[in-house]
Amino acid sequence: MQFTTFALLAVAAATASAQAPQAYYGQGAKSAQVHTFETRKAVPTRVAEVYGEHEQERVTKTKVYHALVTEEAQHHGEEHKAAPYKAYKVYSVASSYSAQPRATHAAEHYGEGKKADHYAEPAKAVHADPHHVDPVKARPTMAATEMKQPEKEAPSTVCAKGSEISCCTTDSSNSGALGNVLGGSCLLQNLSLLSLNSNCAAANTFCCPTTQEGTLNINLSCIPISL
């Protein structure tokens, strides 16, 4: 009888010890499942709350902005009422000219006047002075101002004294005054330095200006001074 009772107690204890871990882990797994479900349900809720807060902030800022714009518009409206500007009506150029020609418009403003092609004759000429010379008519023509061509051979010319004038001659192909006009150059003649700036020796020479002295006058451009 005692053995049987002991055996039953042992079996009951073994069964209880075997079921205890299973019950513990079963409750833990269930708790974890509940926690995970609650977390998944809470995350979208929090996102929605944050979005709602941002949206509310945006709406508030928008209302403040619109209030400022409205206040500014009212302020400018009050300024315009205090100092109104004059509005001008815009007319089309084409329509205004077609509806009201220029001559009619001028007649309304200035009254009927004389015709445009009729003017009173002057009592006397504007320039009654007989010594008055019309500058247009007195302008010289090309025929009057035509340059005279120099003679082929110019007479000997007396050059001015000083270092700014010397004698020059032409090249061999163009002799005389014509050669100088066509581009002869100042050449050193067979003259002493003292004879420079004096009478030109030959008939085919000119006086040529220069800023140099003596032999430095060679190959300067020849410019006729006087004949």
Curated annotation (Swiss-Prot):
Disruption phenotype: When the four class I hydrophobins (hcf-1 to -4) are partially silenced, approximately 10 times fewer conidia are produced an the germination efficiency of conidia is reduced by about 50%.
Positions bearing carbohydrate: 190, 219
Disulfide bonds: 159-207, 167-200, 168-186, 208-222
Spans through the membrane: none
Inducing stimuli: Expression is increased during sporulation. Expression up-regulated by carbon or nitrogen starvation.
Keyword hit for Secreted: yes
Subcellular location per the Swiss-Prot or TrEMBL entry: Secreted; Secreted, Cell wall
Signal peptide (from-to): 1-18
UniProt KW Translocase keyword: no
Family of this protein: Belongs to the fungal hydrophobin family.
Subunit structure as annotated in this protein's UniProt entry: Self-assembles to form functional amyloid fibrils called rodlets. Self-assembly into fibrillar rodlets occurs spontaneously at hydrophobic:hydrophilic interfaces and the rodlets further associate laterally to form amphipathic monolayers.
The protein's name in its UniProt record: Class I hydrophobin 4
